[in-house]
Amino acid sequence: MQTDTNICLNCGAGSARDARLCANCAAPLVLDSKGSVAVWRLGEVRPEVLDGIARMIGKSLGLPVVVQPALLDPRPSRRPDWRGASATAFLNQVDRRAGSGKGRGTVFSLGITEENIVPGSAWNYLFGYAYLGQPSCVVTLHQMSSDSPSLRHLVRRAATIAIHEIGHNCGLDHHGYDEGIACVMTADTELDCLERLDEGTHRFCRACQLVVDRKLAGLRS
């Protein structure tokens, strides 16, 4: 029995990951995302938040953003004894979809969820998670929604984290806070919090932007 299906938002049925249409109701599940940022959802995500994040990412990277109609199967990432879903399992689900079927040619694959995600049982929360130099990353709205921000504020937070994680996909590492660089890649896992996130920027510094531009140029060639 397959345990990582795509879930139809229309009828709730599961279908194979490479199925374009729902096996039960024929609703679309996977759209062509070649040359785009593909967005996958683990559970339902507020449409107005999702739309705002997609707009900011598209503007930052100069790429179209395709929100896939299907939801990710929640079973692989469930960890009943943890404080959230497994960030690694969630990321692996997104990564598996990046290179198969309609996902072939996707520039980056981004997972978004309203659930809390953690990399292990000792963790309380994450903002995002990524593979360095690989084309997949995930973002959670859970912690950044904890102080009931406005829609605009939440979208900015989430888009900032998404752009940061895509920076890791491009091979970028962190700047330290002590460097005083205004860049979306400024971070420290021991210091990161909502206050730090709100003080930062969603833009790359000049040096990081050059790396991202070279990466995108290579992918387009």
Feature roles, as predicted:
Residues 127-157, 173-221:
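Metalloprotease/metallohydrolase-associated module, dominated by Zn2+-dependent proteases
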Residues 32-46:
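Fold-level signature of zinc-dependent metallopeptidase catalytic domains
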Residues 12, 26, 206-209:
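Cys/His-coordinated zinc-binding microdomains
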Residues 4, 18, 163, 201:
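Short metal-coordination and nucleic-acid-contact micro-motifs, chiefly zinc-binding Cys/His arrays
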Residues 14-16, 30, 175, 213:
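Short functional micro-motifs and their immediate structural scaffolds
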Residues 44-161, 173:
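Metzincin-family zinc-dependent endopeptidase catalytic domain
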Residues 7, 14, 21, 184, ...:
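The −1 position to Zn-ligating cysteines in a subset of zinc-ribbon hairpins
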Residues 25-32:
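Short Cys/His-rich micro-motifs in 6-15 aa windows
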